């Protein structure tokens, strides 16, 4: 019987209407009179309002309509206290008090009977009580009133219940209301106390049973109906309700509603959680607050809980309460005891373990175990309560622990307990095991195992012979223990409840009887369930492993049905195991599968499959993509692949074997399918999982080898499984995993497995249905390819059925498909799948073939259109064409259409990128909507061709769509344009948007009238205006939507935005552009709509972007300003004034263009570094510089645009613009000199010329001042030395050139005006501008002759005028327009006016080279000169200036004014200057600097040691040795104690390491293994002391040594070796540029017997070139690694990381360099190869130029390295300048450029990569030429060192000549181009490589 509160009887239309009216009338008191009137109309239909005697209201039978009114009133609680009190007094209380005796009309009574509802009296009482409870909860002041009503109610019930059954029915409804709604705590407590007193009176319960059993009035239909429904009215039922109310109240007080468990389980869990925290094993997810709240609630109600527990103990101790007279009463009695036990579980939380109450609780639980635990009549709730109570006690006492552990297996073995109950009880039992040691649970599991027993013949063993013997208390459970209060009232069959069959009797039965077998099956099922539940909930690896071990042993030892139970349980346990245990479990399943297959045990095999499916479902649902998941997936796939393994490949096999293996494979299909997502869900993502991808492919190959084909019986039987597998499978061939060796299909071992002739024939027939016989020629096509095609047909056809037809295209990306000549088959298959997909859509299910899934398929096809593989791209275009024409609606979806438009944008961006980053192209482009990344090859021609092709196809496809669904498509296009608003605000070109606009405006046949229009004229008409108006409406609608709030709300939001932005600025936080954009949009909207204060809004609209001062914020702001000026012209002047003010303030603040923070230092002043070319760092710094200056560019463009728009509008505006222009250009003297500042400067000057032109036309007084400031501002740029354009962004350089030309032309137009006001200054400016234009143009096209270039010869008067203007300008002008005559004039001017030039370091050379100087005094002015570069300063120590103290003093001053780290680099040069140090200046410099930098002192000492001897053996002393020894001794003696300790630690450590070479000498002729053993032995002895470092790595500290890294190097007489050290150092983060500490392993070579000083010099020069090129952002790559000479013939060399020499490649059998690249990076079409080739080109160009200039010889393959990124690196510089090995000049070529190098670049001098190499060589050469003197200054001091590479000053002459200083830049470019041509495959290069092969065995 249902206890329904919604009452079907009152669900009539009238009842619903009354309920609705009641809710409205008791709702919010907006119209109190109206509500009151309605309520009165409803309630006054009740008899209580019209009866003459309301005290007899119960005598009037309650009708259906009155019932509906009363229940409706009870549902709606009034919102006012007065109304509640009125209803309570007038209606609720009177009817409530009369419910015990209320009469019911026959109609109402019969309706309830028909509907099988409870008695109307019970339900009416329930509703009225619920009303009072909720009213008291809402208005606690009613507590006393309602409490009084309830007291009166109890009194009436006690009077009436013996007379009328309605009294008991009413009481049942009353109690149930409080059970369901204990929300009013105090009222529920009050009621519980009343009921407790009632039942404690034993007479009440006795009287109830007496009346029910004997009274004639209590035998009507209602009593029978309650009995039949299982709710027999009895004292047991009332007691159960009261006990349930008690539990409900406690649960409410403890707030257990969020848990969902019963009370005892909740209390047990809380104790467990507390235990975990106490033991410090709590999980991170555990909620401590819940535990704290729980204990707080317990403490708050302690006394009340104590009273409850005492009453519960009283009831539990009275055994006579148990009423077993009927099934229902027995159930109520046991449930009552369960509720009281749940209550008693509070005792451990409120009492000490020593208390009497706790002791009583323990006894009650013990007694319950003895009496009820194994009884066959108790309810599951009592069993759970007993187990929960005993488990809880385990946390506090061990008294019952042993009993519970012993009894639990017997409980599980009980024949009357269900498996469901066992599962529930086992969970509770497991929780109670945690405070015990692990032995307890092990013991329990073994006890379970003992129950799983079978006899020798496999029959079940009687496991319980005498149960009494195992019960700890020794008491017997007999039926006589339960006294029947009234046996005469027992129903038939009650005796069966008593379980009078003893265990002994059961044991004596025939073990093979049917009953026993049934019991045994139940026993096994329960034991397995309990064991697995315990293991999974205890969740420790040891217990899980034990459980699995026990259960696996039982398989095949019992019945087949029970095998299924055990296997199923093992499967459910599997996801909780470790990887190791799971692996063992899989092996078990595998072994059982083998056994089942071998003995043909289909039942066992079926059970195994079911168990595997359970594992699959569990892993899919709860552990998807976990390690366990993939282990199981791999196991299933491996099992499929291993099926049918053969020893001999390509061997014929019989059809019977093929069929048998096919059936074997089929057993794995269901578990595999269950493990994978079903079609329609997101498929398994294994795009980057090489192992899983290959396993899936091999599985499909094995399918077809063993007879799986479409239409075959085995495929039909397993089609649903194959469908899911196919849906998640990768394509059988693709570019992943990268198959660099291009292995053919013939090499796949699975495809080469033999098959039967019948299967091969069937597979051929299958593929013939797709491919005609011409494509698949049986005789020429191998069986491997046949099987591959068959597998592809099978997989892709089934995948198509699963809703995916797009994967076939990916086959073309695999080189083996193209090389295997089956690409035509794949093309046919691809088309077939698309056509099949189009057919399936018509009849497919919506889950797979809905519009989104169809659009997704097209989306996948569209993404292939940009693939670099031509065959795949062609197939993709063909596939898209068919797909869109077959299913036009597929493109009418934002997913596919947006992808198409985004791809157009991405490809257009890629073309821009190839211009902007010619030598460093982007390969990855992200589609803006889907965020999908597409890979684009570096070829600019490919990019342009692909865009053109896609654009053409896209037009056709969108035309088709517009003709089919014109309006829908245009709405999508509008959405696309609107969605990209954020991008388009910052990006100038969005090709996809442009395309969308074009297509939306087309007139198509869908436009019935316009398409038939006859038009004339050059332009076709379009519908773009209608589209734009619709789009404008849509934008306006969005705009209006954004401002639907009131102006006050918007103002408040604006205030919050400005406050947040300024707060973040103050705190130095990054400002998000969107925040600024949102603020500007809101403020502009408010301003334009006229709802705000204009002045205040304009102030913020202008000032905030300037305060944020980012490129994005100012770009958006300038657009907003122009919008305001257009839409709100009355405030335009106000806004312009504010912009002008902020512009000038930003100039005063020295930010943006007017900041010098990003200026580049001169190359010679920069810190030289031994590190790889850092293009990422260069780009980062360049980006920072550009972004810092861009804001001013946007403002300048705003000025220029608005100036042109308001020309001649007013004098006031002209004055404002003039003021802005003047302030900007007059401050250009302090503006940035970064290369990126040039264009912005010239934009400003162009704006100024516009203002000048306007002023000239209006005759303004500012003409003269503007002219002068323009000239001065323009000339301020040329104070920087001439430099090539920065970076490789040709678009930027071309724009720079364009702006400079525009400025030059604009000034020429104003030449008369400029000449009149500026005189020669204007002419000087013309020289500079012409030179600048030529410089930029030359850089863009160095080999093309520029008309009029180098024609501006300087005259003497121009030189003099420029010198008078600024000596620095004169020097820079000479550098640009050199002539000997002009130089002589300038030298004279510098000598004559030396003090004017002291601020210009570059003027010093001119000053000291004057031939007219006759005495020292003439050079006294040098003492005032600005410091020059460290190299120049060092060169002033050379003999030429040794006699001039002014020069020597200046050089000391100049060096000391520099950072010591700059001088650090030039230690070799400084040491060599000691040769000429007659005055001691150099010695003093060294000693003074050593005091400042201890690292400098160490480097000096090592270099001095290396220069003491002329020979490598340290025998022939150098004449400088005494000087070096003296200085070294003085230096060391001057060290402080800490410096001396550091010095001793460092040199001792280094001596220990280098000393290994000496200890290796006795092993020189021994094997490498013996040498290595000796090195490792010595390395193990070295102690790493604090702060020690390698001499080659002074900026890092050695923290560890790889003691086993020692490696002897090849040498005939010496013992060099290599070792690896762990270095800790600070490096720059490539992204942020900030220093971060890293630890890395660094290998170093300790060389003996070779003079390393030449290598040091060569690497110094390479580092200098690196700095020169990085200063202009040139895209070349060099790696000046570190070499330090530490003693005669000794040195430390850093090993290039991740590199291998070319000769080692030859030794490793790599045929050529190109083959190495393809094997390592993939074929030429891969992005990896293209990136590596790009790196190769850049590095080869850099080293080629250096090789020529420094004359690197001995360039055999042993001295050329290749790193893992494709860079070509040079090492070993023993032969440079004027020395060649052995005097043999085989290498009479500029540099090494072999055929294999050219092959990597494309194979010929016409390929793009080769042309890039040529261009980079030319630009690297041009960039180096202006720094020839710096390079010579680095070499000059070393000439006296005695190094063999020098031939005196001839070396310097030759070096200078290689720079071709006499040639123009254009001539020098042609010269370098000729050198490249000469080097390409020179016969000398080939001859030298052959010489090295013959003499040293170095391959080439």
From Swiss-Prot:
GO terms for molecular function: 1-phosphatidylinositol 4-kinase activity; ATP binding. InterPro entries: ARM-type_fold (IPR016024), Kinase-like_dom_sf (IPR011009), PI3/4_kinase_cat_dom (IPR000403), PI3/4_kinase_cat_sf (IPR036940), PI3/4_kinase_CS (IPR018936), PI3K_accessory_dom (IPR001263), PI3K_accessory_sf (IPR042236), PI4K_N (IPR045495). The modification Phosphoserine is found at residue 459. Pfam families: PI3_PI4_kinase (PF00454), PI3Ka (PF00613), PI4K_N (PF19274). Present with 846 molecules/cell in log phase SD medium. It is an enzyme of class 2 (transferase). Its EC number is 2.7.1.67. Keywords: ATP-binding, Kinase, Nucleotide-binding, Phosphoprotein, Transferase. Residues 1617-1884 form the PI3K/PI4K catalytic domain. PROSITE patterns: PI3_4_KINASE_1 (PS00915), PI3_4_KINASE_2 (PS00916), PI3_4_KINASE_3 (PS50290), PIK_HELICAL (PS51545). It comes from Saccharomyces cerevisiae (strain ATCC 204508 / S288c) (Baker's yeast). The keyword Nucleus does not apply. GO terms for biological process: autophagosome-lysosome fusion; autophagy of mitochondrion; cellular response to nitrogen starvation; cortical actin cytoskeleton organization; macroautophagy; microlipophagy; phosphatidylinositol phosphate biosynthetic process; phosphatidylinositol-mediated signaling. Residues 1531-1648 are annotated as: Pleckstrin homology (PH) domain conferring phosphoinositide binding specificity. Belongs to the PI3/PI4-kinase family. Type III PI4K subfamily. Residues 1623-1629 are annotated as: G-loop. The keyword Cell cycle does not apply. This is Phosphatidylinositol 4-kinase STT4. Residues 1751-1759 are annotated as: Catalytic loop. One of its GO terms (cellular component) is plasma membrane. It catalyses: a 1,2-diacyl-sn-glycero-3-phospho-(1D-myo-inositol) + ATP = a 1,2-diacyl-sn-glycero-3-phospho-(1D-myo-inositol 4-phosphate) + ADP + H(+). Acts on phosphatidylinositol (PI) in the first committed step in the production of the second messenger inositol 1,4,5,-trisphosphate. STT4 functions in PKC1 protein kinase pathway. Residues 1345-1530 form the PIK helical domain. Residues 1770-1794 are annotated as: Activation loop.
């Amino acid at each position: 019987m249902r206890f329904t509160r919604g009452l079907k009887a009152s669900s009539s239309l009238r009842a619903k209407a009354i309920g609705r009216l009641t809710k409205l009338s008791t709702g919010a008191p907006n119209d109190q009179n109206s509500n009151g009137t309605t309520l009165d109309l409803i309630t006054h239909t009740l008899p209580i309002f019209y009866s003459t005697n309301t005290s007899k209201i119960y005598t009037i039978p309650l009708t259906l309509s009155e019932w509906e009114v009363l229940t409706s009133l009870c549902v709606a609680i009034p919102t006012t206290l007065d109304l509640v009190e009125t209803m309570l007094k007038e209606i609720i209380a009177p009817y409530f008090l009369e419910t015990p005796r209320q009469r019911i009309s026959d109609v109402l009574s019969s309706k309830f009977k028909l509907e099988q509802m409870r008695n109307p009296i019970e339900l009416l009482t329930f509703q009225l009580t619920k009303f009072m409870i909720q009213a008291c909860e809402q208005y606690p002041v009613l507590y006393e009133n309602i409490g009084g009503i309830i007291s009166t109610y109890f009194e009436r019930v006690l009077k009436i219940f013996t007379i009328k059954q309605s009294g008991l029915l009413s009481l049942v409804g009353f109690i149930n209301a409080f059970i369901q709604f204990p929300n009013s705590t105090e009222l529920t407590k009050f009621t519980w106390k009343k009921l407790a007193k009632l039942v404690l009176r034993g007479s009440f319960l006795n009287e109830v049973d007496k009346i029910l059993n004997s009274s004639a009035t209590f035998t009507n239909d209602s009593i029978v109906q309650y009995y039949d429904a299982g709710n027999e009215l009895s004292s047991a039922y009332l007691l159960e309700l009261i006990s349930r109310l008690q539990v409900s109240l406690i649960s409410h007080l403890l707030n257990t509603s969020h848990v969902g468990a019963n009370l005892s389980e909740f209390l047990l869990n809380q104790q467990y959680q507390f235990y975990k925290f106490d033991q410090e094993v709590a999980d991170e997810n555990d909620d401590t607050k819940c535990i704290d709240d729980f204990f707080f609630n317990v403490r708050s109600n302690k006394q009340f809980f104590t009273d409850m527990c005492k009453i519960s103990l009283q009831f539990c101790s009275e055994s006579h309460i148990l009423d077993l007279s009927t099934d229902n009463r027995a159930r109520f009695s046991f449930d009552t005891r369960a509720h009281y036990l749940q209550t008693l579980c509070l005792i451990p939380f409120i009492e000490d373990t020593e208390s009497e109450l706790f002791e009583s609780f323990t006894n009650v639980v013990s007694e319950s175990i003895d009496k009820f635990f194994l009884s066959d009549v108790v309810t599951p709730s009592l069993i759970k309560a007993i187990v929960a109570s005993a488990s809880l006690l385990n946390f506090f006492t061990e008294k019952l622990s042993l009993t519970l552990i012993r009894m639990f297996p017997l409980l599980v073995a009980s024949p009357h307990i269900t498996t469901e109950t066992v599962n529930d009880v086992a969970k509770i039992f497991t929780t109670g095991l945690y405070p015990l040691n692990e032995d307890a649970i092990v013991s329990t599991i073994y006890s379970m195992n003992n129950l799983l027993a079978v006899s020798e013949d496999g029959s079940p063993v009687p496991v319980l012979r005498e149960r009494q013997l195992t019960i700890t208390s020794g008491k017997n459970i007999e039926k006589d223990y339960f006294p029947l209060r009234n046996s005469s009232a027992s129903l038939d069959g009650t005796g069966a409840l008593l379980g009078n069959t003893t265990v002994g009797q059961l044991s004596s039965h025939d073990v093979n009887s049917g009953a026993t077998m049934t019991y045994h099956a139940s026993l096994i099922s329960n034991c397995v369930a309990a064991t697995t539940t315990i293991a999974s909930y205890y969740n420790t690896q040891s217990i899980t492993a034990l459980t699995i071990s026990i259960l696996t042993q039982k398989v095949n030892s019992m019945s087949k049905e029970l095998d299924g139970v055990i296997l199923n349980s093992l499967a459910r346990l599997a996801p909780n195991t470790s990887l190791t245990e799971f692996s063992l479990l899989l092996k078990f399943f595998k072994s059982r599968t083998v056994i089942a297959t071998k003995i043909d045990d289909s039942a066992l095999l079926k059970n195994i499959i079911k168990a595997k499916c359970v594992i699959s479902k569990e892993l899919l649902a709860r552990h998807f993509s976990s390690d366990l998941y993939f282990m199981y997936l791999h196991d299933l796939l491996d099992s499929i692949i291993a099926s049918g393994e053969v020893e001999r490949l390509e061997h014929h096999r019989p059809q019977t074997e093929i069929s048998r293996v096919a059936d074997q494979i089929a057993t794995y299909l269901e578990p595999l399918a269950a493990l994978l997502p079903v079609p329609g869900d997101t498929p398994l993502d294994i795009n980057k999982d090489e192992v899983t991808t290959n396993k899936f492919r091999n599985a499909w190959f094995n399918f077809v080898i063993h007879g799986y084909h479409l239409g075959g019986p085995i495929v039909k039987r397993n089609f649903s499984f194959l469908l899911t597998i196919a849906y998640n499978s990768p394509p059988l061939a693709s570019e992943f995993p990268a198959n660099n060796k291009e292995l053919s299909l013939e090499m796949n071992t699975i495809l080469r497995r033999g098959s039967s002739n019948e299967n091969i024939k069937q597979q051929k027939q299958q593929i013939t249905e797709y491919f005609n016989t011409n494509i698949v020629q049986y005789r020429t096509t191998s069986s491997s390819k046949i099987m591959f095609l068959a597998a592809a047909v099978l997989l892709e056809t089934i995948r198509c059925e699963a809703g995916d037809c797009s994967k076939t295209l990916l086959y073309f990306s695999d080189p083996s498909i193209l090389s295997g000549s089956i690409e035509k088959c794949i093309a046919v298959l691809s088309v077939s799948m698309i056509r099949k997909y189009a057919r399936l859509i018509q009849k497919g299910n919506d889950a797979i073939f809905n519009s989104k899934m169809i659009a997704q398929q097209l989306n996948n096809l569209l993404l292939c259109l940009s693939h670099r593989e031509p065959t795949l791209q062609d197939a993709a275009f063909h596939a898209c064409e068919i797909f869109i024409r077959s299913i036009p609606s597929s493109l009418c979806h934002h997913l596919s259409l947006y992808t198409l438009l985004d791809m157009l944008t991405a490809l257009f961006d890629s073309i821009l990128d190839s211009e902007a980053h010619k030598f460093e192209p982007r390969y990855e482009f992200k589609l803006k909507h889907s965020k999908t990344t597409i890979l684009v090859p570096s070829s600019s021609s490919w990019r342009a061709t692909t865009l053109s092709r896609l654009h053409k196809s896209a037009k056709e496809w969108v035309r088709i769509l517009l003709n089919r669904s014109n309006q829908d498509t245009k709405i999508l296009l509008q959405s696309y344009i609107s969605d990209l608003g954020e991008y388009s605000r910052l990006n100038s070109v969005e090709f996809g948007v442009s395309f969308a606009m074009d297509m939306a405006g087309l007139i198509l046949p869908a436009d019935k009238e316009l398409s038939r229009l006859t038009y004339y004229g050059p332009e076709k008409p379009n519908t773009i205006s209608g589209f734009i108006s619709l789009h404008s409406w849509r934008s306006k609608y969005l705009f209006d939507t954004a401002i639907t709030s009131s102006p006050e709300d918007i103002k408040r939001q604006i205030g919050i935005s400005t406050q947040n932005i300024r707060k973040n600025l103050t705190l130095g936080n990054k400002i998000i552009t969107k925040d600024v954009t949102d603020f500007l949009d809101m403020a502009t909207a408010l301003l334009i709509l006229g709802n705000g204060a204009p002045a205040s809004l304009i102030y913020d609209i202008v000032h905030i972007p300037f305060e944020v001062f980012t490129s994005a914020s100012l770009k958006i702001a300038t657009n907003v300003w122009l919008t305001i000026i257009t839409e709100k012209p009355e405030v335009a002047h106000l806004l312009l004034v504010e912009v002008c003010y902020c512009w000038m303030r930003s100039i005063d603040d020295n930010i943006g263009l007017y900041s010098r923070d990003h200026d580049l230092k001169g190359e010679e002043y920069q810190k030289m570094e031994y590190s790889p070319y850092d293009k990422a760092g260069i780009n980062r710094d360049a980006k920072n510089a550009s972004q810092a200056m861009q804001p001013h560019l946007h403002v300048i463009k705003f000025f220029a645009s608005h100036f042109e728009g308001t020309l001649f509008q007013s004098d006031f505006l002209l004055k404002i613009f003039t003021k802005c222009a003047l302030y900007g250009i007059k401050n250009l003297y302090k503006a940035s000199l970064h290369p990126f500042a040039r264009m912005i400067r010239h934009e400003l000057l162009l704006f100024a010329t516009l203002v000048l032109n306007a002023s000239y036309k209006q005759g303004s007084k500012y003409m003269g001042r503007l002219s002068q400031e323009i000239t001065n501002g323009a000339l301020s740029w040329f104070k920087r030395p001439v430099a090539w354009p920065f970076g490789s962004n040709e678009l930027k350089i071309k724009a720079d050139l364009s702006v400079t030309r525009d400025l030059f032309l604009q000034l020429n137009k104003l030449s008369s005006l400029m000449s009149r006001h500026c005189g020669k200054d204007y002419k000087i400016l013309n020289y500079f501008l012409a030179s600048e234009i030529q410089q930029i143009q030359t850089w863009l096209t160095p080999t093309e002759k520029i008309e009029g270039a180098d024609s501006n010869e300087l005259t003497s008067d121009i030189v003099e005028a420029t010198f008078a203007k600024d000596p620095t300008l004169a020097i820079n002008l000479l550098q640009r327009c050199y002539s000997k005559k002009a130089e002589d004039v300038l030298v004279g001017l510098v000598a004559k006016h030396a003090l004017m030039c002291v601020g210009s370091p570059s003027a010093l050379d001119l000053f000291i080279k004057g031939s007219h100087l006759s005495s020292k005094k003439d050079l006294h002015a040098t003492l005032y000169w600005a410091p020059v570069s460290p190299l120049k300063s060092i060169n002033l120590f050379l003999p030429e200036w040794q006699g001039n103290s002014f020069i020597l003093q200046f050089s000391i001053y100049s060096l000391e004014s520099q950072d010591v780290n700059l001088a650090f680099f030039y230690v070799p040069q400084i040491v060599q200057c000691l040769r000429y140090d007659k005055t001691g200046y150099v010695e003093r410099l060294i000693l003074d600097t050593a005091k400042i930098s201890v690292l400098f002192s160490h480097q000096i000492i090592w270099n001095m040691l290396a220069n003491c001897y002329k020979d490598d053996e340290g025998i022939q002393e150098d004449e400088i040795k005494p000087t070096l020894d003296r200085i070294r001794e003085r230096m060391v003696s001057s060290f402080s104690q800490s410096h001396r300790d550091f010095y001793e630690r460092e040199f001792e450590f280094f001596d220990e390491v280098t000393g290994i070479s000496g200890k290796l000498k006795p092993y020189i002729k021994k094997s490498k293994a013996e040498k290595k053993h000796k090195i490792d032995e010595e390395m193990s002895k070295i102690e790493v002391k604090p702060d020690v470092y390698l001499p080659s790595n002074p900026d890092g500290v050695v923290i560890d040594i790889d003691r086993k890294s020692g490696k002897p190097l090849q040498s005939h007489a010496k013992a060099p070796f290599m070792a690896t050290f762990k270095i800790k150092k600070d490096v720059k983060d490539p992204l942020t540029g900030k220093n971060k500490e890293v630890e890395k392993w660094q290998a170093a070579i300790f060389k003996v017997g070779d003079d390393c000083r030449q290598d040091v010099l060569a690497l110094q020069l390479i580092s200098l070139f690196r700095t020169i090129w990085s200063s202009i952002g040139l895209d070349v790559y060099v790696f000046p690694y570190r070499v330090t000479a530490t003693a005669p013939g000794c040195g430390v060399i850093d090993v290039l990381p991740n590199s291998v020499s070319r000769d080692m490649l030859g030794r490793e059998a790599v045929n050529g360099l190109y083959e190495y690249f393809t094997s390592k990076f993939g074929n030429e079409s891969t992005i990896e190869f293209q990136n590596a080739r790009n790196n190769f080109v850049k590095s080869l160009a850099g080293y080629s130029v250096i090789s020529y200039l420094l004359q690197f010889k001995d360039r055999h393959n042993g001295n050329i390295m290749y790193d893992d990124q494709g860079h070509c690196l040079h090492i070993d510089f023993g032969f440079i300048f004027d020395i060649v090995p052995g005097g043999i000049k085989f290498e009479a070529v500029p540099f090494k450029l072999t055929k294999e190098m050219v092959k990597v670049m494309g194979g010929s001098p016409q390929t793009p990569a080769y042309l890039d190499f040529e261009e980079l060589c030319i630009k690297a050469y041009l960039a180096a030429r202006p720094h020839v003197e710096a390079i010579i200054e680095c070499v000059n001091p070393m000439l006296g060192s005695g190094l063999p590479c020098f031939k005196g000053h001839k070396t310097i002459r030759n070096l200078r000549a290689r720079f071709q200083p006499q040639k123009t830049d254009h001539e020098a470019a042609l010269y370098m181009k000729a050198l490249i041509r000469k080097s390409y495959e020179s016969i000398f290069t080939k001859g030298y490589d052959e010489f090295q092969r013959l003499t040293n065995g170095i391959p080439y």
